[in-house]
Amino acid sequence: MKLLLAFRLVIPALVLAAPLHVAAAAAAATPEQKLTALGLTLPTVPNPVANYVPAVRSGNLIFLAGHIPRDAAGKVITGKAGRDATEKESNAAARQATLAVLATLKREIGDLGKVKRIVRVGGFVNATEDFQAQSQVVNGSSDLLVELFGDRGRHARAAIGVGSLPLGALVEIEMIVEVE
């Protein structure tokens, strides 16, 4: 009975706190301020592991190579959705990979406020044959982009299940972004 009472007290507090956190992020003026309000930081941009560059600018478009998720220690988040990771864990990995893409973008343009539009996101999910929630996993990326950029963050998208990814990564996110 005491446990049930504790849940009745804690759950409403969590529900009330969540909108305040989201509201603070929405009120922030720049994408960088929104990251801070959400308690997020951009990771260090890693060096490419093969013969490619992480970003190519052509006119006002920046094509960002696929980025994989890493934990706070810089270790690649690995596994297969549907076997080693749940949909929720895979969604969080997509969010982490998106932060890595944004770190590369910021290094390329200097200020995320210069983003005019997230044009396209490609999401690749390392998954078992029977895993069918690729779209829900890649929502980890899409939702973050809308949180940070508002309507400028709404984009075309592909969410694709694959048999493996570089370094055994759980997900990989690539982007095309229009900038000033």
Which stretches of residues belong to each language-model region?
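N-terminal secretory signal peptides that target proteins for export/translocation
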Residues: 1-5
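Bacterial N-terminal signal peptides
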Residues: 6-21
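Short, polar/acidic, helix-capping and beta-turn segments at strand->helix junctions
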Residues: 24-180
